[in-house]
Amino acid sequence: MDPLTAIAASGMRSRTETLDLLANNIANAGTSGYKADSESYDLYFGSDAWDGFHQNRPMGAEMPLVQRNWTNFSQGTLMDTGHMGDVALSSEGFFVVQTESGPLYTRTGHFRIGKSGRLETEDGYAVRAVGGKPIQLDPAKPFTISTSGQVSQDNAPVGNLEVLSVDTVDNLTKRGGTYFMLSPGAKTSPAKDTEVLQGKVEASNVEPTQAAVKLVGVLRQFETLQKAVRIASEMGKEAVEQVAKVG
């Protein structure tokens, strides 16, 4: 593969990954608690690129590549719903839910009372109380949640929502749309100065207009790279034809 085609093909692959990411962000612009993803590029320092340099291969064949995706954890707008099962956090921290594979962390506070009487997410995951146990409620009765996270029924406390902060958000990996898994060995602590707000939800932090503008720009870049590949292919054919004529 000639250097021009290699560079363009690498760029097209990176743009394809970016397009997928942007499309997913736009699709989740209306998903409560969703955190937008972005990408960072490894342009020059990948091991493959350096190997190519030392072996006199075109480094462009390995560049640019999407090195990793990262998540924007900035807070979304808090929106009033008035619904008993909707809960938002005023500041940092995450709700903790229990799954078969272990705890997950989320900013999405769409909760309900399940058939077994436990407080759970819309996906059926148990919402954990401080200490890690599920919160059991009477499905026939309403419940309240104080700003400190205390869940009560009939004016009697039944548990406190577990709201934790992590030492660094780099230790969180997205698992599904609005859930995150904590890296082994990462540290957590009770979220400080964070209020639990019943009857509110946190909107997605995706900026749809900004994402759409960026998507159009990436599409144009992709089309330009496609054109470069086509031109390189035509140049290659012409070169072969000229050699054949000389021969």
Indicate where each model-derived feature is located.
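Amphipathic alpha-helical polymerization modules
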Residues: 1-247
